[in-house]
Amino acid sequence: MFGRFLELSVTTPDIAASVQFYERLGFAQLATGDALPHPYGVLSDGRLYLGLHQRTGPARRLSFVHPGLARHVHELLDAGFEPHAARLGDDDFHELQLRDPAGQDIALLEARTFSPPRSDHDRSHCGWFSGYSLPAFDIEQVRDYWERAGFVALDVTDDPLAQVALTSDTLTLSLHQPRAIAAPLLVFTDPDMPERLARLAAAGVHAARGLPAGLDPRANALFEAPEGTLLLLIAEG
């Protein structure tokens, strides 16, 4: 329904500082096009694509690509999705903006805005990107929204944070209670996470405060990017 996941679009007041932070975590820059009017860069670990946008607007958007977007509007409306903003003019780079019941911003774009990597990139220093976790007071309402968008919901029983996982072929979302942590999270896992955390600390990348309750700080850590994006690194197994 939404198309293929493109990137987590992140608004940053200082794109250079954000790029430097993610490169220290092992992300690599990709080539971008000229469809956007503001400074824009993309970094990836081979699974996650972070689009850094030096502009005003929502802090984070989940961006998808759906060719023929103008013709797709009626299908979205019929399925109960109502865009709150649209750019569909003949001279526009077509875009629809939506928002899920938990307040997560979503963008549907006519075409890609960066070139995919020519070869697989090794995972970042953070470990395996397992998904994007959203805080949601009404888990069932948010679950229904993403199921209607084509995601498959799975109940989670062995995760220290997430209660529901929502999967597609290009992105996994999870839902957690805001009392655990009130912000969205990029979640990475690795069975050897303590060693990864030690290497990051030795390289001068230090964890932020506010690790969700129940997670051992010796084996798990929360990092905050300059623009405010939170990355949760969890020991797996």
Segments the model singles out, each with a brief description of its role:
Residues 1-2, 9-49, 133-171:
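Core segments of cupin and vicinal oxygen chelate
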